[in-house]
């Protein structure tokens, strides 16, 4: 077992922390969010009765906050032993992590504000539990297992990946024939991407930016880098708050889609001369660079809602700056030689999770995403022989199962196909 300690042990060693009150506050947050997560509530009832995950060990690298914690406890209720750490050094809520670590079937290593060495030590600590299932947000755990612990690959049933960046990494790994066990691309299934990516990212990113800066969007030029599902959500929600939205893209069809939906579309360096607020949503690196910083207006706000802290090139910005200082909690100002100040939120990390005031996506949308995660884990265990190594789409029947639970919870009834309609749709012989 790794020498890296679970959070409870770390807090016990800190005489300035009241561990019990910290756990109580974390539990209070978890209970509040669970009230607004009817899918997880229903799955808790099912998993508690059938114990579909009995005997399995689940290793997780996720954003450890209240909504994620309810997924963790659902998996534990289903019979699994769960070890978890963070997938971002700044996104963990320590009170929630402490509450999780008090569950006898859960070990949490997640702690906010760790350095790079401790971040990867915590991942190693989770891997030391020898998981049979992995759940990732960004693919760091899958990578660590393949790179440093290939001896575990034969005993891993499969995994699930939460986010766009992680799925991109997994597909690249799969194309190189390096991925050695099946992983569900949870990010790509409709019940995740149409809600979590659009409404979750759009609402939480803009809300966090507004609360962190205490500024309005009305009348401002908001530049959205990337027009995938996350970028669409940010653009849509910003326009709804009376911002003028400018989109930058590298993919011609997405650029055309943004144009046809009424947004201005232009290269980043042109948008840089006009933007008041910049939000990156690409999952790629060097989206905003030195040539863009050089033409931005004084007071520009820069935030990342994509994934890793490489979308805004902070190394180049630091080289341009003659001074840097904390302008406000969660806001780092970079003063340039000509007196302009460019303001970076949350150190360029995921603003909706890493900013000091951040709470992540709304509970209702994460309920759907985490419902998919839970049924994917169940599917891997129940039908393990059906999946070869590689990236797999979430089976449609699982996506529909979660949608049906949500509709029932919302009190929404829908029609069903008649037998005649089903036969018509399945037939190829009907013409005009």
Curated annotation (Swiss-Prot):
One Pfam family, short name: AdoHcyase_NAD
Superkingdom, taxonomy of origin: Archaea
Query: CDD domains under this entry?
Result: SAHH
**Cofactor binding comment, as recorded:** Binds 1 NAD(+) per subunit.
Q: Where, by residue number, does substrate bind?
A: 137, 162, 192, 196
Q: What class of enzyme is it?
A: hydrolase
One biological process term in Gene Ontology:
S-adenosylmethionine cycle
Q: What InterPro entries does the entry give?
A: Adenosylhomocyst_ase-like_sf, Adenosylhomocysteinase-like, Ado_hCys_hydrolase_NAD-bd, NAD(P)-bd_dom_sf, S-Ado-L-homoCys_hydrolase_CS
* UniProt GO molecular function: adenosylhomocysteinase activity
Q: Which NCBIfam families match?
A: ahcY (TIGR00936), PRK05476.2-3 (NF004005)
Q: Where in the cell is it found?
A: Cytoplasm
**EC number annotated for this UniProt entry:** 3.13.2.1
Disulfide topology: none
Annotated binding of NAD(+), by residue:
163-165, 197, 226-231, 249, 284, 305-307, 352
Q: Does the keyword Cytoplasm apply?
A: yes
* Pathway(s) per entry: Amino-acid biosynthesis; L-homocysteine biosynthesis; L-homocysteine from S-adenosyl-L-homocysteine: step 1/1
Q: Which PANTHER family match?
A: ADENOSYLHOMOCYSTEINASE (PTHR23420:SF0)
Q: Which Gene3D superfamilies does this entry report, sorted A to Z?
A: Adenosylhomocysteinase-like, NAD(P)-binding Rossmann-like Domain
Q: What exactly does this protein do?
A: May play a key role in the regulation of the intracellular concentration of adenosylhomocysteine.
A GO-annotated cellular component: cytosol
Region of interest: Disordered: 1-24
Instruction: Identify the cofactor(s).
Output: NAD(+)
Task: Report keywords, A-Z.
Answer: Cytoplasm, Hydrolase, NAD, One-carbon metabolism
Q: Which reaction does it catalyse?
A: S-adenosyl-L-homocysteine + H2O = L-homocysteine + adenosine
- For whether the record's keyword set contains Hydrolase, the answer is yes
What protein am I looking at? Answer: Adenosylhomocysteinase
């Amino acid at each position: 077992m790794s020498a890296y300690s679970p959070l409870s042990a770390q807090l016990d060693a800190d005489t300035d922390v009241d561990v019990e009150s910290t756990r109580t506050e974390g539990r209070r947050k978890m209970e509040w969010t669970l009230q607004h997560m009817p899918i997880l509530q229903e799955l808790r009832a099912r998993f508690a009765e059938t114990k579909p995950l009995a005997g399995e060990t689940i290793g997780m690298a996720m954003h450890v906050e209240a909504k994620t914690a309810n997924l963790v406890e659902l998996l534990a209720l289903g019979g699994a032993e769960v070890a978890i750490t963070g997938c971002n050094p700044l996104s963990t809520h320590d009170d929630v992590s402490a509450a999780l670590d008090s569950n006898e079937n859960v070990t949490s290593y997640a702690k906010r504000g760790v350095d790079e060495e401790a971040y990867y030590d915590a991942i190693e600590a989770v891997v030391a539990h020898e998981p049979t299932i992995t759940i990732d947000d960004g693919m760091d755990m899958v990578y660590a297992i393949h790179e440093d612990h290939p001896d575990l690959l034969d005993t891993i049933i499969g995994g699930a990946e939460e986010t766009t960046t992680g799925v991109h990494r997994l597909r690249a790994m799969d194309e190189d024939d390096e991925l050695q066990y099946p992983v569900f691309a949870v990010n790509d299934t409709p019940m995740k991407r149409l809600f979590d990516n659009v409404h979750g990212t759009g609402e939480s990113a803009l809300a966090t930016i507004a609360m962190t800066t205490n500024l309005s969007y009305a009348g401002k030029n908001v530049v959205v880098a990337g027009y995938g599902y996350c970028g669409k959500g940010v653009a849509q929600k910003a326009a709804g708050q009376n911002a003028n939205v400018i989109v930058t893209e590298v993919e011609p069809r997405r650029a055309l889609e943004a144009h046809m939906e009424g947004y201005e579309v232009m290269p980043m360096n042109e948008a840089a001369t006009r933007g008041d607020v910049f939000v990156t949503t690409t999952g790629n690196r060097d989206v905003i660079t030195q040539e863009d910083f050089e033409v931005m207006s004084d007071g520009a706000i820069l935030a990342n809602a994509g994934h890793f802290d490489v979308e805004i090139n902070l190394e180049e910005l630091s080289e341009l700056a003659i001074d840097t200082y904390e302008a406000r909690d969660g806001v780092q100002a970079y003063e340039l030689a000509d007196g302009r100040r460019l303001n970076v939120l949350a150190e360029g990390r995921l603003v909706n999770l890493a900013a000091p005031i951040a709470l992540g996506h709304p509970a209702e949308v994460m309920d759907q995403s985490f419902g998919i995660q839970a049924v994917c884990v169940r599917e891997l265990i129940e039908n393990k022989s059906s999946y070869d190594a590689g990236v797999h789409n979430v089976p449609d029947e699982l996506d529909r199962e979660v949608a049906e639970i949500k509709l029932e919870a919302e009190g929404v009834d829908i029609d069903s196909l008649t037998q005649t309609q089903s036969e018509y749709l399945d037939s190829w012989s009907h013409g005009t």
